[in-house]
Protein backbone atom coordinates (compact mmCIF):
# COMPACT_ATOMS: atom_id res chain seq x y z
CA UNK A 1 0.00 0.00 0.00
CA UNK A 2 1.30 3.46 -0.90
CA UNK A 3 0.05 6.74 0.56
CA UNK A 4 -0.55 9.55 -1.93
CA UNK A 5 -1.57 13.18 -1.38
CA UNK A 6 -5.13 14.10 -2.20
CA UNK A 7 -5.81 15.64 -5.58
CA UNK A 8 -5.21 19.38 -5.46
CA UNK A 9 -3.50 19.24 -2.08
CA UNK A 10 -0.87 21.98 -1.66
CA UNK A 11 2.77 21.09 -1.21
CA UNK A 12 3.86 20.65 2.38
CA UNK A 13 7.16 21.06 4.15
CA UNK A 14 8.94 18.79 6.62
CA UNK A 15 11.64 20.21 8.89
CA UNK A 16 13.94 17.96 10.90
CA UNK A 17 16.06 19.20 13.79
CA UNK A 18 18.07 17.64 16.56
CA UNK A 19 19.45 18.94 19.84
CA UNK A 20 21.79 17.86 22.60
CA UNK A 21 19.25 18.34 25.41
CA UNK A 22 15.51 18.41 25.91
CA UNK A 23 15.83 21.94 27.33
CA UNK A 24 17.49 23.17 24.13
CA UNK A 25 14.84 21.45 22.04
CA UNK A 26 11.98 23.08 23.93
CA UNK A 27 13.67 26.51 23.92
CA UNK A 28 13.96 26.33 20.17
CA UNK A 29 10.39 25.11 19.78
CA UNK A 30 8.96 27.99 21.83
CA UNK A 31 11.05 30.53 19.91
CA UNK A 32 9.99 29.09 16.56
CA UNK A 33 6.30 29.03 17.51
CA UNK A 34 6.57 32.72 18.39
CA UNK A 35 8.29 33.44 15.07
CA UNK A 36 5.62 31.57 13.10
CA UNK A 37 2.94 33.66 14.73
CA UNK A 38 4.85 36.87 14.00
CA UNK A 39 4.94 35.83 10.34
CA UNK A 40 1.15 35.57 10.25
CA UNK A 41 0.15 32.07 11.41
CA UNK A 42 -2.67 32.28 13.94
CA UNK A 43 -2.02 30.69 17.32
CA UNK A 44 -4.99 28.36 16.80
CA UNK A 45 -3.43 27.01 13.60
CA UNK A 46 -0.42 25.65 15.49
CA UNK A 47 -0.35 22.39 17.45
CA UNK A 48 2.28 20.49 19.41
CA UNK A 49 1.76 16.73 19.60
CA UNK A 50 3.62 14.47 22.02
CA UNK A 51 3.67 10.79 22.83
CA UNK A 52 3.71 11.30 26.61
CA UNK A 53 2.00 13.62 29.06
CA UNK A 54 5.24 14.54 30.85
CA UNK A 55 6.70 15.94 27.62
CA UNK A 56 3.43 17.77 27.01
CA UNK A 57 3.68 19.49 30.38
CA UNK A 58 7.28 20.54 29.72
CA UNK A 59 6.22 22.08 26.40
CA UNK A 60 3.39 23.93 28.14
CA UNK A 61 5.75 25.41 30.71
CA UNK A 62 8.20 26.58 28.06
CA UNK A 63 5.51 28.16 25.88
CA UNK A 64 4.06 29.97 28.89
CA UNK A 65 7.52 31.37 29.64
CA UNK A 66 7.46 32.85 26.13
CA UNK A 67 3.98 34.36 26.69
CA UNK A 68 2.40 32.07 24.10
CA UNK A 69 -1.34 31.48 24.65
CA UNK A 70 -1.67 27.73 25.00
CA UNK A 71 -4.38 25.16 25.64
CA UNK A 72 -3.84 21.58 26.79
CA UNK A 73 -6.42 19.34 25.13
CA UNK A 74 -7.32 16.36 27.30
CA UNK A 75 -7.39 15.86 31.06
CA UNK A 76 -4.26 13.68 31.20
CA UNK A 77 -1.95 16.55 30.30
CA UNK A 78 -3.59 18.86 32.83
CA UNK A 79 -2.83 16.63 35.81
CA UNK A 80 0.87 17.52 35.90
CA UNK A 81 0.40 21.29 35.75
CA UNK A 82 1.54 23.17 38.87
CA UNK A 83 -1.95 24.54 39.52
CA UNK A 84 -3.65 21.14 39.10
CA UNK A 85 -1.24 18.63 40.67
CA UNK A 86 -1.70 19.93 44.27
CA UNK A 87 -5.48 19.62 43.93
CA UNK A 88 -5.30 15.98 42.85
CA UNK A 89 -2.70 15.22 45.54
CA UNK A 90 -4.90 16.77 48.24
CA UNK A 91 -7.94 14.80 47.10
CA UNK A 92 -5.92 11.58 47.30
CA UNK A 93 -4.59 12.41 50.77
CA UNK A 94 -8.16 13.02 51.98
CA UNK A 95 -9.16 9.48 51.05
CA UNK A 96 -5.99 7.37 51.25
CA UNK A 97 -3.89 7.23 54.45
CA UNK A 98 -1.09 5.58 52.46
CA UNK A 99 -0.81 8.34 49.85
CA UNK A 100 2.80 8.86 50.93
CA UNK A 101 4.08 10.25 47.64
CA UNK A 102 1.31 12.85 47.61
CA UNK A 103 1.88 13.84 51.25
CA UNK A 104 5.61 14.24 50.62
CA UNK A 105 4.94 16.25 47.46
CA UNK A 106 2.54 18.61 49.21
CA UNK A 107 4.77 19.14 52.25
CA UNK A 108 7.87 19.92 50.20
CA UNK A 109 5.99 22.00 47.61
CA UNK A 110 5.81 25.77 47.29
CA UNK A 111 3.03 26.13 49.83
CA UNK A 112 4.41 24.29 52.87
CA UNK A 113 8.12 24.09 52.05
CA UNK A 114 8.98 21.53 54.69
CA UNK A 115 12.74 21.02 54.86
CA UNK A 116 14.33 17.74 53.83
CA UNK A 117 15.67 17.10 57.34
CA UNK A 118 12.15 17.46 58.74
CA UNK A 119 10.77 15.18 56.03
CA UNK A 120 13.40 12.55 56.85
CA UNK A 121 12.47 12.72 60.55
CA UNK A 122 8.81 12.36 59.58
CA UNK A 123 9.61 9.31 57.45
CA UNK A 124 11.45 7.66 60.35
CA UNK A 125 8.50 8.39 62.63
CA UNK A 126 6.18 6.78 60.07
CA UNK A 127 8.22 3.57 60.30
CA UNK A 128 8.08 3.68 64.10
CA UNK A 129 4.28 3.76 64.00
CA UNK A 130 3.99 0.50 62.04
CA UNK A 131 2.83 -2.23 64.47
CA UNK A 132 5.62 -4.70 65.19
CA UNK A 133 8.24 -2.64 63.40
CA UNK A 134 11.68 -3.01 64.95
CA UNK A 135 13.98 -0.03 65.34
CA UNK A 136 16.41 0.51 62.48
CA UNK A 137 19.35 2.74 61.82
CA UNK A 138 18.33 5.99 60.08
CA UNK A 139 18.40 5.65 56.30
CA UNK A 140 19.29 8.31 53.71
CA UNK A 141 16.21 10.34 52.80
CA UNK A 142 15.90 8.82 49.32
CA UNK A 143 15.86 5.31 50.83
CA UNK A 144 13.40 6.34 53.55
CA UNK A 145 10.96 7.67 50.94
CA UNK A 146 11.45 4.68 48.65
CA UNK A 147 10.54 2.34 51.50
CA UNK A 148 7.46 4.41 52.28
CA UNK A 149 5.98 3.88 48.83
CA UNK A 150 7.27 0.39 48.00
CA UNK A 151 5.76 -1.92 50.63
CA UNK A 152 3.18 -4.20 49.07
CA UNK A 153 1.36 -5.12 52.30
CA UNK A 154 -0.89 -2.18 53.33
CA UNK A 155 -1.10 -3.53 56.89
CA UNK A 156 2.65 -3.06 57.31
CA UNK A 157 3.18 -0.02 55.12
CA UNK A 158 4.34 3.14 56.91
CA UNK A 159 2.04 6.16 56.62
CA UNK A 160 3.49 9.65 56.42
CA UNK A 161 0.05 10.97 57.25
CA UNK A 162 0.03 9.02 60.52
CA UNK A 163 3.39 10.57 61.36
CA UNK A 164 2.07 14.04 60.53
CA UNK A 165 -0.84 13.50 62.92
CA UNK A 166 1.38 11.91 65.59
CA UNK A 167 4.98 13.19 65.25
CA UNK A 168 5.89 12.01 68.76
CA UNK A 169 9.48 12.89 69.62
CA UNK A 170 10.61 13.12 66.01
CA UNK A 171 13.49 15.55 65.49
CA UNK A 172 11.44 18.12 63.61
CA UNK A 173 12.33 21.81 63.69
CA UNK A 174 10.02 24.28 65.44
CA UNK A 175 9.12 25.88 62.11
CA UNK A 176 8.48 22.44 60.64
CA UNK A 177 6.16 21.54 63.52
CA UNK A 178 4.21 24.77 63.00
CA UNK A 179 3.78 24.01 59.31
CA UNK A 180 2.69 20.46 60.02
CA UNK A 181 0.07 21.72 62.48
CA UNK A 182 -1.36 24.06 59.84
CA UNK A 183 -1.26 21.24 57.28
CA UNK A 184 -3.20 18.83 59.53
CA UNK A 185 -5.68 21.56 60.43
CA UNK A 186 -6.34 22.23 56.76
CA UNK A 187 -6.88 18.54 55.99
CA UNK A 188 -9.23 18.19 58.98
CA UNK A 189 -11.29 21.13 57.75
CA UNK A 190 -11.53 19.67 54.24
CA UNK A 191 -12.49 16.21 55.54
CA UNK A 192 -15.60 17.71 57.09
CA UNK A 193 -16.85 18.28 53.53
CA UNK A 194 -16.18 14.83 52.07
CA UNK A 195 -19.92 14.20 51.79
CA UNK A 196 -20.34 17.14 49.40
CA UNK A 197 -20.87 16.50 45.68
CA UNK A 198 -17.48 15.92 44.08
CA UNK A 199 -17.46 19.10 41.92
CA UNK A 200 -18.16 21.23 45.01
CA UNK A 201 -15.40 19.48 46.95
CA UNK A 202 -12.96 20.07 44.11
CA UNK A 203 -13.81 23.78 44.08
CA UNK A 204 -13.43 23.90 47.85
CA UNK A 205 -9.95 22.34 47.68
CA UNK A 206 -8.90 24.79 44.96
CA UNK A 207 -10.15 27.70 47.05
CA UNK A 208 -8.55 26.41 50.26
CA UNK A 209 -5.18 25.99 48.55
CA UNK A 210 -5.40 29.52 47.18
CA UNK A 211 -4.77 28.32 43.64
CA UNK A 212 -7.53 30.29 41.92
CA UNK A 213 -6.36 33.57 43.47
CA UNK A 214 -2.79 32.73 42.46
CA UNK A 215 -3.81 32.09 38.86
CA UNK A 216 -5.90 35.27 38.78
CA UNK A 217 -2.78 37.22 39.66
CA UNK A 218 -0.98 35.47 36.80
CA UNK A 219 -3.89 36.28 34.49
CA UNK A 220 -4.91 32.74 33.50
CA UNK A 221 -7.45 30.54 35.28
CA UNK A 222 -8.41 28.61 32.14
CA UNK A 223 -6.65 25.37 33.11
CA UNK A 224 -8.31 25.32 36.54
CA UNK A 225 -11.67 25.99 34.91
CA UNK A 226 -11.19 23.12 32.47
CA UNK A 227 -10.19 20.80 35.31
CA UNK A 228 -13.33 21.70 37.26
CA UNK A 229 -15.48 21.01 34.19
CA UNK A 230 -13.75 17.65 33.70
CA UNK A 231 -14.40 16.70 37.33
CA UNK A 232 -18.05 17.66 36.89
CA UNK A 233 -18.57 15.62 33.74
CA UNK A 234 -16.26 12.62 34.11
CA UNK A 235 -17.71 9.23 33.03
CA UNK A 236 -19.10 7.95 36.34
CA UNK A 237 -19.22 4.22 35.59
CA UNK A 238 -20.38 3.24 39.09
CA UNK A 239 -23.10 5.89 39.08
CA UNK A 240 -22.44 7.02 42.65
CA UNK A 241 -20.52 10.20 41.87
CA UNK A 242 -17.93 9.36 44.51
CA UNK A 243 -14.53 10.93 45.05
CA UNK A 244 -13.00 7.45 44.76
CA UNK A 245 -14.57 7.12 41.33
CA UNK A 246 -13.15 10.46 40.20
CA UNK A 247 -9.67 9.61 41.46
CA UNK A 248 -9.76 6.21 39.75
CA UNK A 249 -10.70 7.92 36.49
CA UNK A 250 -7.93 10.51 36.85
CA UNK A 251 -5.39 7.76 37.54
CA UNK A 252 -6.56 5.87 34.47
CA UNK A 253 -6.38 9.02 32.34
CA UNK A 254 -2.82 9.76 33.45
CA UNK A 255 -1.53 6.22 33.08
CA UNK A 256 -3.61 4.75 30.27
CA UNK A 257 -5.49 7.74 28.85
CA UNK A 258 -4.89 6.79 25.24
CA UNK A 259 -8.50 7.28 24.25
CA UNK A 260 -10.62 7.61 27.36
CA UNK A 261 -11.65 11.12 26.46
CA UNK A 262 -12.50 12.54 23.04
CA UNK A 263 -10.32 15.47 22.01
CA UNK A 264 -12.35 18.67 21.74
CA UNK A 265 -10.10 21.72 21.29
CA UNK A 266 -11.80 25.04 21.87
CA UNK A 267 -12.00 27.76 19.22
CA UNK A 268 -9.81 30.05 21.32
CA UNK A 269 -6.84 31.60 19.53
CA UNK A 270 -4.23 29.52 21.33
CA UNK A 271 -1.63 26.91 20.48
CA UNK A 272 -3.09 23.44 21.05
CA UNK A 273 -1.09 20.89 23.04
CA UNK A 274 -2.22 17.27 23.05
CA UNK A 275 -1.00 13.72 22.93
CA UNK A 276 -0.93 12.01 19.56
CA UNK A 277 -3.75 9.68 20.67
CA UNK A 278 -6.12 12.61 20.97
CA UNK A 279 -5.16 14.17 17.64
CA UNK A 280 -7.04 11.65 15.51
CA UNK A 281 -9.33 13.44 13.07
CA UNK A 282 -7.83 16.89 13.73
CA UNK A 283 -5.61 19.05 11.51
CA UNK A 284 -3.59 22.25 11.86
CA UNK A 285 -1.55 24.41 9.50
CA UNK A 286 1.65 23.79 11.50
CA UNK A 287 2.39 20.80 13.70
CA UNK A 288 5.42 20.23 15.93
CA UNK A 289 6.46 16.71 16.94
CA UNK A 290 9.13 17.03 19.65
CA UNK A 291 11.02 14.27 21.47
CA UNK A 292 11.19 11.71 18.67
CA UNK A 293 13.92 9.94 20.60
CA UNK A 294 14.40 6.30 21.56
CA UNK A 295 12.19 5.28 24.45
CA UNK A 296 9.91 8.29 24.01
CA UNK A 297 8.31 7.82 20.59
CA UNK A 298 7.99 4.96 19.88
CA UNK A 299 7.24 4.39 23.53
CA UNK A 300 7.95 1.30 25.57
CA UNK A 301 5.26 -1.36 25.85
CA UNK A 302 3.10 -0.58 28.91
CA UNK A 303 0.51 -3.32 28.32
CA UNK A 304 2.81 -6.02 29.67
CA UNK A 305 2.83 -9.78 29.41
CA UNK A 306 0.30 -11.49 31.66
CA UNK A 307 2.29 -14.74 31.59
CA UNK A 308 5.15 -13.04 33.46
CA UNK A 309 3.18 -10.45 35.46
CA UNK A 310 0.56 -11.77 37.89
CA UNK A 311 -1.02 -8.31 38.28
CA UNK A 312 -2.29 -8.38 34.70
CA UNK A 313 -5.56 -9.93 33.59
CA UNK A 314 -4.89 -13.03 31.45
CA UNK A 315 -5.41 -12.25 27.79
CA UNK A 316 -8.17 -14.88 27.29
CA UNK A 317 -10.29 -13.16 29.96
CA UNK A 318 -10.07 -9.66 28.48
CA UNK A 319 -13.01 -8.10 26.73
CA UNK A 320 -10.90 -7.56 23.61
CA UNK A 321 -9.53 -11.11 23.63
CA UNK A 322 -10.45 -11.65 19.97
CA UNK A 323 -8.34 -8.67 18.90
CA UNK A 324 -5.10 -9.29 20.82
CA UNK A 325 -2.36 -11.95 20.67
CA UNK A 326 -3.05 -15.11 22.65
CA UNK A 327 -0.70 -17.64 24.23
CA UNK A 328 -1.50 -20.83 22.32
CA UNK A 329 1.31 -23.08 23.57
CA UNK A 330 2.61 -23.10 27.15
CA UNK A 331 5.98 -24.58 26.18
CA UNK A 332 9.11 -22.41 26.26
CA UNK A 333 8.96 -22.10 22.50
CA UNK A 334 5.32 -21.05 22.67
CA UNK A 335 5.98 -18.50 25.40
CA UNK A 336 8.91 -17.04 23.43
CA UNK A 337 6.73 -16.82 20.32
CA UNK A 338 3.99 -15.12 22.32
CA UNK A 339 6.47 -12.59 23.71
CA UNK A 340 7.66 -11.79 20.20
CA UNK A 341 4.07 -11.46 18.98
CA UNK A 342 3.38 -8.94 21.75
CA UNK A 343 6.43 -6.93 20.68
CA UNK A 344 5.25 -6.89 17.08
CA UNK A 345 1.75 -5.89 18.15
CA UNK A 346 3.17 -3.01 20.19
CA UNK A 347 5.35 -1.88 17.29
CA UNK A 348 2.37 -1.90 14.95
CA UNK A 349 0.37 0.15 17.48
CA UNK A 350 3.17 2.72 17.70
CA UNK A 351 3.41 2.83 13.90
CA UNK A 352 -0.28 3.66 13.71
CA UNK A 353 0.27 6.51 16.15
CA UNK A 354 3.21 7.76 14.12
CA UNK A 355 0.99 7.81 11.04
CA UNK A 356 -1.60 9.86 12.92
CA UNK A 357 1.08 12.28 14.13
CA UNK A 358 2.67 12.77 10.72
CA UNK A 359 -0.64 13.43 8.93
CA UNK A 360 -2.05 16.14 11.21
CA UNK A 361 -0.16 18.99 9.48
CA UNK A 362 -1.70 20.73 6.49
CA UNK A 363 1.42 22.66 5.42
CA UNK A 364 4.34 22.35 7.86
CA UNK A 365 5.53 19.42 9.98
CA UNK A 366 8.43 20.10 12.35
CA UNK A 367 10.11 16.99 13.77
CA UNK A 368 12.76 17.18 16.49
CA UNK A 369 14.70 14.97 18.89
CA UNK A 370 17.20 15.23 21.74
CA UNK A 371 19.87 13.06 23.32
CA UNK A 372 19.85 14.12 26.97
CA UNK A 373 17.33 15.07 29.62
CA UNK A 374 17.36 15.14 33.43
CA UNK A 375 17.64 11.70 35.00
CA UNK A 376 19.31 9.95 32.06
CA UNK A 377 22.55 8.04 32.57
CA UNK A 378 22.96 7.30 28.87
CA UNK A 379 22.13 9.43 25.87
CA UNK A 380 19.03 8.62 23.89
CA UNK A 381 19.37 7.66 20.28
CA UNK A 382 17.20 8.92 17.46
CA UNK A 383 13.95 7.03 17.05
CA UNK A 384 13.16 5.27 13.81
CA UNK A 385 10.39 7.81 13.21
CA UNK A 386 12.93 10.62 13.37
CA UNK A 387 15.05 8.75 10.82
CA UNK A 388 12.02 8.28 8.57
CA UNK A 389 11.30 12.01 8.69
CA UNK A 390 14.96 12.83 8.08
CA UNK A 391 14.87 10.68 4.95
CA UNK A 392 12.14 12.97 3.60
CA UNK A 393 14.13 16.12 4.28
CA UNK A 394 17.60 17.20 3.34
CA UNK A 395 18.94 18.23 6.72
CA UNK A 396 22.20 18.34 8.60
CA UNK A 397 22.86 14.83 9.89
CA UNK A 398 22.57 14.34 13.60
CA UNK A 399 25.82 13.06 15.09
CA UNK A 400 25.58 9.75 16.92
CA UNK A 401 24.82 10.20 20.63
CA UNK A 402 27.92 10.40 22.81
CA UNK A 403 29.03 7.24 24.58
Region roles according to the model:
Residues 13-16, 70-72, 273:
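Conserved beta-strand scaffold positions in the cores of enzyme catalytic domains, especially
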Residues 402-403:
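Acidic, low-complexity intrinsically disordered tails
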Residues 42-43, 53-68, 81, 88-364, ...:
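Conserved helicase C-terminal RecA-like lobe
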Residues 1-49, 103-104, 146, 158-171, ...:
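Inter-lobe coupling/hinge region of RecA-like P-loop helicase motors
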Residues 75-82:
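Glycine-rich loop motifs involved in handling phospho/adenylate chemistry
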Amino acid sequence: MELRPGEGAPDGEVRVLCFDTLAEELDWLATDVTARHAEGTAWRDIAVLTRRNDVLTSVWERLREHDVPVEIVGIGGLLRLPEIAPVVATLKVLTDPLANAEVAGLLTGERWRLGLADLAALARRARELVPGETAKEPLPLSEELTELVSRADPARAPSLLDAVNDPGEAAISDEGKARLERFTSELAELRRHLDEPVPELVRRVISRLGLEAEQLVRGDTSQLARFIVACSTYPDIDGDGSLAGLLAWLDAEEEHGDALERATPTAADSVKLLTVHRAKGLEWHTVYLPALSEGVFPGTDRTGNWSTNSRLLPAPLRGDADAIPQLADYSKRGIDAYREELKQEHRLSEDRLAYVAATRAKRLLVVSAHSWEPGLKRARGRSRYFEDAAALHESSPMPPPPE
